[in-house]
């Protein structure tokens, strides 16, 4: 515990908020153009080819965004919507593409958790 004299000399410092997704500039989502669409491998215990895209946002920032779901139609110059949310086993990937919005098509034949992948309700 600090003494009163120590607190007079140097007051307590309030903890500063640090955003987990700074490129969004406090927006819920951001639009951007894919500059490169490629696959990458995850960190140590996991093994896969994860689909990611390098995206230039409307505020001129370049970020790496994860493309969720099975299969996608994205290529260079595709316009996508980006939301926050990191991928734990991909270092440097701190954003997700929103499926079913702009040029990113929803996941085909998706039955469960459809709203997360932009899939329409299947006909009964």
Curated annotation (Swiss-Prot):
Keywords: Methylation, Ribonucleoprotein, Ribosomal protein, RNA-binding, rRNA-binding, tRNA-binding. Transmembrane segments: none annotated. GO terms for biological process: translation. PROSITE patterns: RIBOSOMAL_S12. Residues 1-25 are annotated as: Disordered. One of its GO terms (molecular function) is rRNA binding. The modification 3-methylthioaspartic acid is found at residue 89. GO terms for cellular component: small ribosomal subunit. Part of the 30S ribosomal subunit. Contacts proteins S8 and S17. May interact with IF1 in the 30S initiation complex. HAMAP family: Ribosomal_uS12_B. Belongs to the universal ribosomal protein uS12 family. With S4 and S5 plays an important role in translational accuracy. Interacts with and stabilizes bases of the 16S rRNA that are involved in tRNA selection in the A site and with the mRNA backbone. Located at the interface of the 30S and 50S subunits, it traverses the body of the 30S subunit contacting proteins on the other side and probably holding the rRNA structure together. The combined cluster of proteins S8, S12 and S17 appears to hold together the shoulder and platform of the 30S subunit. This is Small ribosomal subunit protein uS12. It comes from Stenotrophomonas maltophilia (strain K279a). The lineage of its organism: Bacteria, Pseudomonadati, Pseudomonadota, Gammaproteobacteria, Lysobacterales.
């Amino acid at each position: 515990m600090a003494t009163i004299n120590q607190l007079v000399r140097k007051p307590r410092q309030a903890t500063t908020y640090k955003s987990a997704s700074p490129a969004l500039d406090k927006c819920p989502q951001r639009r951007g153009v894919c500059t490169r669409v490629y696959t990458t491998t995850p960190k140590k215990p996991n093994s896969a080819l994860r689909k990611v895209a390098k995206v230039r946002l409307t505020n001129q920032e370049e970020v790496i965004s994860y493309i969720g779901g099975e299969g996608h139609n994205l290529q260079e110059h595709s316009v996508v919507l980006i939301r926050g949310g990191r991928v734990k086993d991909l270092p440097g990937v701190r954003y997700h593409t929103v499926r079913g919005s702009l040029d990113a098509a929803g996941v085909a034949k998706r039955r469960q958790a459809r709203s997360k992948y932009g899939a329409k309700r299947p006909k009964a």
